[in-house]
């Protein structure tokens, strides 16, 4: 089937921001102006289309990335129809995984900032994720109608805090209550939106006299940024002193896609001003799937191969999100990088080595859906009923295999025990937890062998609270939840140059014999686990070496200090012996496990605890109290900045163990006037007194 929209007119964009910057409202306005919604949804009354889970509507925050397709012909109807796939991503730190996954499959992003709050901690996290995947982006400064709004302050923060290179393409007319529109620096005209039509109509006018000087100054910066795109344009600019509109747009597009600049706009989504111009900027400056480099992957032999965004290429796609839908069951969201996917096709999953048959294909609009027959290169859609595909896996042509780069998911830092309230809940709970863990790779479920309890782990208290809540609402499982527990780790600080493990059993008939000698060394943080085979002369036969590795790996989940997972250790197998008759895989696994445990004891084992980056915004009067309290929680205060309009931002690194219940405590310390955000930073060695307490508590 021929394309309705050429690939050059596709835009796959994410809308990303700090919590409360007004991102979901911005998305709602996009859906309204592109004609998808005929009634405006508001986050604060729980009617926003993109926030479709019950918890999201109650809490007024976005938890899962909803994917929506919209169409845009330009604010003045002056463009051919463009197809925009929008992914709305959450702004709460506990849901960073959602942002990470959407960044992996997007071509461009709109970063939304609050004109009052500016660049906040989560803005920095999101910016880092966009850098990691090389996503070109625009900046949209929202809430220009709020008291304390300051477009130019946010411009400065983008430069200093994010090391961005923002290029304003509009500047505000008025501020706070008197914000009425923007000066378009490309056209050098004022844009005033009509309030009666909820911003669907607008007028170009002359730039207000009092803004002419400012507009000329920023126009100059805009033209300079455009001229820097090529020597040819720079010469033209130096000769004529200016550039025309087409030159500017082509140059800004080129530099935005290269990641050199970020066009910057402003408005107030809630008051229906500015989002329309931002949509035009999405078309003008953000890439189509054809503008980005071909996607990298590997063939079956591990050789690098590429696929371009072309319908004629062999099919390849990445599954980037799983979701349970109450009506159609399991949905797998896929980004098609090359070729065409049709319902009824059989495709290949190279990670599992399995074939999958494609059932129905759906184009999603928040939680409404439209059935489609095929998905073309560059598009995003949901597949119904894939049996064995998890987040981050590749789907490809059955005869032309490619494995796309997998996504990286963070390790959980907090755990809780969950127990079903009744026998009936017991059976349903296992199913509910495995379904939720399949959807969310940053959520883990395991059984504690000693206590028999089910332990759930995630990225923060809110993350686990919402998952338990979903278990109740979506699966009808009532559960009791234990106190949050810190996800400690264990490692070693010294080498153990030689440690022996010997497993010998003689009980008549065939016995067991395994004998290994290992060397253990600490790895740098984040090194994980490494196994080296340094056997010479066949003292341990080839076929038993994988069993040694496996024996060590099976020991890693429970360390010798307090039974926490062991990380950052290198084990080298360099000697051993075997018996012609009695040796087998199991005997070598047991010997390796014994040697590793003993080696850990000799190599100065230590307990590691998760450290959190905490940022508190507080009125100045309470700054001293807040800092004192953070220090009493074993926190290291790393700095304090002024907030424009009064108040202080305090940055600190604090152990997670000391942060439980902090929200309540901070409220009482500051009479409810301070707010904070917290995200995982790294693991660090726990002080001896803390480690002793944790070890003693686990030993009870």
Curated annotation (Swiss-Prot):
Localization terms from the record: Cytoplasm
This protein's name: Elongation factor G
Family the entry assigns: Belongs to the TRAFAC class translation factor GTPase superfamily. Classic translation factor GTPase family. EF-G/EF-2 subfamily.
One of the record's GO cellular component terms: cytoplasm
SUPFAM superfamilies membership: EF-G C-terminal domain-like (SSF54980), P-loop containing nucleoside triphosphate hydrolases (SSF52540), Ribosomal protein S5 domain 2-like (SSF54211), Translation proteins (SSF50447)
Main location: cytoplasm
An example Gene Ontology molecular-function term: translation elongation factor activity
Ranges that cross the membrane: none
Domain tr-type G: 8-290
Listed HAMAP family: EF_G_EF_2_B
Name of the coding gene: fusA
InterPro entries named among the record's database cross-references: EFG_II, EFG_III, EFG_III/V, EFG_IV, EFG_V, EFG_V-like, EFTu-like_2, G_TR_CS
Function of the protein: Catalyzes the GTP-dependent ribosomal translocation step during translation elongation. During this step, the ribosome changes from the pre-translocational (PRE) to the post-translocational (POST) state as the newly formed A-site-bound peptidyl-tRNA and P-site-bound deacylated tRNA move to the P and E sites, respectively. Catalyzes the coordinated movement of the two tRNA molecules, the mRNA and conformational changes in the ribosome.
One BP annotation, GO: ribosome disassembly
Keyword tags: Cytoplasm, Elongation factor, GTP-binding, Nucleotide-binding, Protein biosynthesis
Residues engaged in binding GTP: 17-24, 88-92, 142-145
